[in-house]
């Protein structure tokens, strides 16, 4: 019985976190590309406006974890793979799943500053309402 309770509690925790990422991802996609998976702005492309450096960082994280999976620059145009990269990036740099940190990380990278990401953070929070 104890094992069942632990499994159910763990499932609820994962489910709640996934629901939070869904809201965050939808808001970021709205701010970044107005929901357009073909959007291009300089070297940022796709639904979440992913830069080549993020793809490289995701592949480094995967390699560090012992995974053979790798993302390509073309994967930035794929909404499913873009979301996977977002979740992977967050799991590495934001393991507690803090929503504010997730938004700021996406805008400013792993060395973000609060001041430098404030306008973006405010836009995404407004889009979440």
Residue ranges and their predicted role:
Residues 4-13:
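Sec-dependent N-terminal signal peptides
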Residues 15-17:
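Intrinsic-disorder/low-complexity linker and hinge segments
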Residues 19-129:
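Catalytic glycan-binding domains that act on GlcNAc-containing polysaccharides
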